[in-house]
């Protein structure tokens, strides 16, 4: 997917994983510029990376919310911005085998939606809910999810990255407070068996 970021600055908050690394690479290819330190406080786009697999220690959802809110205030002051949360699809469909992980992601999703309400129209705040994604190994989700995924396969890193690019695209000016599930249809109800 190609978009024109026209030199927009991008800040990253959270853990590294193959999906976020590929998203950052794609944003740079599309004329985005990664900034760190003091420059990150005035970034045009904030990408917040949450753990995508159960068992990975997550940052406190309240801490992530506070970071995102602080950036939203700064973005509002300089006129506009985008915040994209990269989180697990369990934010919308909890897994019985992973209650804490599901609750943490649902909490982050609720925080994302409150930020969208508070800071619109200047700041667009959205999330990409990643289901089972594999490279050589499971990058996101749980292998058990695959038996309940209507498309019958794991997703690719590139498919998750395309959703991030959609939310960052300057032509996308009307979407906020949404989570786009990149999960092969898992959230359509199949998760209840977990």
Feature roles, as predicted:
Residues 149-160:
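A conserved structural motif in NAD(P)-dependent oxidoreductases
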Residues 5, 31-60, 124:
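A glycine-rich helix->loop->beta "capping" turn
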Residues 1-35:
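Canonical Rossmann dinucleotide-binding motif of NAD(H)/NADP(H)-dependent dehydrogenases/reductases
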Residues 49-67, 73-77, 82-120, 132-133:
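Catalytic loop of short-chain dehydrogenase/reductase
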Residues 120-124, 175-177:
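Short, small/polar-rich loop/turn modules that mediate ligand/substrate recognition or access, typified
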Residues 165, 176-194:
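Short C-terminal tail/terminal secondary-structure segment
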Residues 124-134, 168, 183:
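Conserved SDR Rossmann-fold cofactor-binding beta-strand/turn motif
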Residues 127-149, 189-194:
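A glycine/serine/threonine-rich, flexible loop-to-helix segment
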